[in-house]
Swiss-Prot record:
Organism: Lawsonia intracellularis (strain PHE/MN1-00)
Family according to the record: In the N-terminal section; belongs to the IspD/TarI cytidylyltransferase family. IspD subfamily.
Protein's UniProt keywords contain Transport: no
One family name in Pfam for this protein: YgbB
The protein's name in its UniProt record: Bifunctional enzyme IspD/IspF
Name of encoding gene: ispDF
Length: 399
């Protein structure tokens, strides 16, 4: 499954434009435009393989330069495409769908005016797609009574228990949503969200719980939600340790994996025995993160007796752990790791590993440290029988 994200920033934003003189998606918050807040959240999800950003045609060239600068500044280790939007929202989406690579199978479509999207919600949408859904939308319960009105007169009052307020990102099987947009062009349909096209084509759209915090910035008063309130913090430290054996002749019937460290492939290194992908560094990191929240260890969450995790990319498991960290109101501030092995030599891969972990953890590169050492020929690592990793994570609990 190859999933890309489309971030729509091509709207006129007329409500805010008339008040503060700038379209909402370009409003600068915490030093960056609103649309980049969404890019950062998608960037930290291992399942996302690339991003398409859609801007008004008159500012596309300028914003492409801004995106290039931000991508370098924030070490965006994802392919990205910058394109011009169309007259209507659905025209912008169709333009973006046509730019996706051939190997893309699924897409998440997100409004840039929702900067408070969480990695947890992104992962929840993707998980439903992985289970076979062709369309999925997040939604929250409606608390107000909703009435249908024509020319100032109430026509009908809708039972609010049957209603939800739909959010983005909305997730789709790519071929299905492309067919929906193509049919919309033929039938001259105009819709306000992409899920409506699947509904009109007779497809089932699944609904998952959205997030109240995932609000849309539309009116000037919405900017008040962007003012952060004072919070108290408590420092936390998590410790993680993991070991993997190297493959020997008597282990040829066990699961054998090519070596990966911190999500980076290490060529010409010894193969490891492992149920998942055998990334000893990510496994130690996950244990350290779980230690921060009192969450047990990775064996509890991803047992090696479960075939679902056979050969799985450990970055996907890390996504699940990071979601639990976010749910616990924990903010990671630093990680320090030591890799212990006689072989392979880590020095030439150190910066690639740091950069990838910086992206996955949403940390500045300066707050990610990777060390490597040997045990001077002693023990199982010194005898080239295996590798181990030790990780210390520093975090704060916010309340």
């Amino acid at each position: 499954m190859e999933t890309w994200a489309l971030i729509l920033a091509a709207g006129q934003g007329s409500r805010l434009l008339s008040t503060i003189g700038i379209a909402k998606q370009f409003f600068v918050w915490k030093g960056i435009p609103l649309y980049w807040q969404s890019v950062l959240q998608f960037m930290h999800c291992a399942r996302i393989r690339g991003v398409v950003l859609v801007f008004p045609s008159e500012v596309k060239d300028n914003e492409e330069k801004v995106v290039d600068r931000l991508a370098a500044q924030y070490d965006l280790r994802l392919p990205y495409i910058v394109i011009s939007g169309g007259k209507l929202r659905q025209d912008s989406v169709k333009n973006a769908l046509n730019t996706l690579p051939k190997n893309c199978s699924h897409v998440l479509i997100h409004d840039a005016a929702r900067p408070f999207i969480s990695p947890k919600l992104i992962n929840n949408v993707i998980e439903v797609l992985e289970a076979g859904a062709v369309g999925v939308v997040p939604g929250i319960s409606v608390t107000d009574t909703i009435k249908q009105v024509i020319q100032g007169e109430v026509i009908v009052t809708r039972p609010r228990e049957q209603l939800i307020a739909v959010q983005t990102p909305q997730g789709f099987h790519l071929k299905t949503i492309v067919e929906g947009h193509n049919r919309a062009t033929l039938e001259k349909w105009t819709v306000t969200d992409d899920a409506s096209l699947l509904e009109l084509c007779g497809h089932t759209v699944q609904v998952i719980n959205g997030e109240i915090e995932n609000r849309k910035i539309s009116f000037p008063q919405d900017l008040l939600y962007m003012v952060e309130q004072p919070k108290t913090t408590v420092p936390i430290v998590g410790y993680g340790y993991d070991v993997h054996k190297y493959v020997t002749e008597d282990q040829i019937n066990q699961p054998i994996r090519s070596m990966r460290l911190g999500g980076i492939s290490i060529p010409n290194a010894p193969n490891v025995v492992a149920h998942s992908d055998g990334d000893v560094l990510l496994h130690a990191l996950m244990d350290a993160l779980l230690g921060c929240i009192g969450g047990g260890d990775i064996g509890l969450h991803f047992p090696d007796s479960d075939k679902r995790y056979d050969g799985i990319n450990s970055a996907i498991l890390l996504d699940h752990v990071l979601t639990k960290v976010l749910e616990s109101s924990i903010k990671i501030v630093h990680m320090d790791a030591t890799i212990v092995a006689q072989l392979p030599k880590i020095s030439q891969y150190r910066e690639a590993i740091r950069s990838n972990l910086s992206r996955l953890l949403d940390l500045d590169l300066a707050n990610v440290n990777i060390k490597a050492t040997t045990e001077e020929g002693l023990g199982f690592t010194g005898e080239c029988k295996g590798i181990k990793a030790i990780v210390i994570v520093t975090a704060i609990r916010i309340s």
